[in-house]
Regions:
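Surface-exposed extracellular loop regions of Gram-negative outer-membrane beta-barrel proteins
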Residues: 150-176
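Beta-strand initiation motifs
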Residues: 61-68, 119-127, 166-171, 211-213, ...
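Structural motif
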Residues: 53-58, 96-118, 155-163, 199-207, ...
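Surface-exposed assembly/interface segments
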Residues: 1-80
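Residue-level marker for isolated small/hydroxyl-bearing positions within beta-strands
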Residues: 48, 91-92, 153, 161, ...
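Surface-exposed loop and turn segments in beta-propeller and other repeat-based domains
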Residues: 1-26, 115-136, 215-228
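A short beta-strand motif characteristic of beta-propeller blades
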Residues: 18-26, 65-72, 127-134, 170-176, ...
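Beta-sheet repeat architectures centered on beta-propellers
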Residues: 1-2, 24-30, 34-37, 138, ...
């Protein structure tokens, strides 16, 4: 049909050309995935599905488990984060103030609610809500809390966001160019040092942006499915002083490869997780005693949450996990 690949063109001049009533085998149209971001609001939780409104889960709302409720007064957004200390709820990529309810999201707008109130998004002299439109890049990709600041990335640049109080509330400083983030969850922070994956390199920020000397860079990016790059997931394994990135290798639509950087020894390793399995999330040991991953070990398996190496035993389904 229309809209997918070359239509009504001679096959001898256009590869993949189709005539009337010849369906396309595949589409060249790429849609963004349904990416979720979560953050704590005290003991409660804020959750955002990209392109929608914030959902609020109140843990003490009832003795019976309840569903999260939509924050109706919130604009549509792409990524949510709660600013430390000053407690502002921030959207990265948001509808701009003054636009209609059905207005599109401006992917370069940072917008925040009133202090301690994630329901009040209308700026006034009586509150601290506001917004800023950043300029370097075409879309805000992700953000993480770091030491005394929030570090945020577009597809082209890195900024720092610091709380300065009224009247501006936040100060935004561009600290790097040509160092954009490859995907929303492709960044981590370790003791005030941020590490992230770009479209063709790895970077760190310790007061200034540095390109990391990755010894496996060529092998990794030559075997990478860039159409699924937003699924890259970065995690920390603090016990072994490692940062791990899960990424989709060529031919896979889900993360099935990994690259690990040891920030204490300055070494790199990479490899394939499973022959047919995937791992989509890696969480450091904090709430639980071991690292937590989500994935499956074969194409026919269901997705599971893995408690890796429980009690120091390396057996069972955990044997194939990195």
């Amino acid at each position: 049909g229309y809209g997918a690949g070359v239509y009504n063109a001679a096959a001898v001049t256009s590869a993949g050309a189709r005539a009337w009533n010849e369906p396309a085998e595949e589409s060249d149209i790429i849609f963004l995935g349904a990416m979720w971001t979560l953050d704590n609001w005290g003991e409660d939780m804020l959750a955002l599905r990209r392109g929608e409104k914030i959902n609020y889960f109140e843990t003490d709302a009832s003795v019976v488990p309840v569903r999260a409720s939509v924050v109706d007064t919130c604009p549509l957004g792409n990524y949510v984060l709660v600013s430390p200390n000053d407690r502002h709820t921030i959207l990265y990529g948001s509808q701009e103030f003054g636009t209609s309810a059905g207005a599109p999201i401006n992917p370069m707008t940072v917008r925040w609610a009133d202090q301690n109130d994630f329901r009040e998004w209308t700026p006034s002299a009586a509150n601290t809500s506001g917004e800023v439109l950043l300029t370097e890049g075409s879309s805000l990709i992700g953000a993480i809390r770091s030491r005394n600041a929030i570090n945020l990335w577009t597809d082209q640049a890195m900024y720092t966001q610091t709380f300065v109080g009224p009247p501006f509330i936040f100060n935004f400083t561009q600290v790097g160019s040509n160092c954009g983030l490859i995907g929303t969850h492709a960044c981590v922070d370790v003791d005030g040092v941020s590490y992230w994956m770009g479209d063709n390199n790895f970077y760190m920020y310790d007061g200034r942006v540095r390109t990391m000397d990755c010894t496996v860079r060529r092998y990794l990016f030559n075997d990478f499915n860039m159409t699924q790059k937003e699924k890259v997931y970065a995690g920390i394994n603090s016990e072994f002083k490692e940062v791990i990135w899960l990424y989709p290798m060529a031919g896979s639509d889900e993360p099935n490869g990994y690259v690990i950087y040891n920030y204490e020894e300055n070494t790199w390793v990479y490899g394939k997780l499973f022959e047919e399995g995937i791992v989509t999330v890696f969480q450091d040991r904090n709430t639980f005693n071991n690292t937590i991953t989500i994935g499956r070990v074969s194409a026919t398996d269901s997705m599971y949450v893995y408690n890796n190496e429980p009690n120091g035993i390396y057996t069972g389904n955990n044997k194939n996990l990195p």
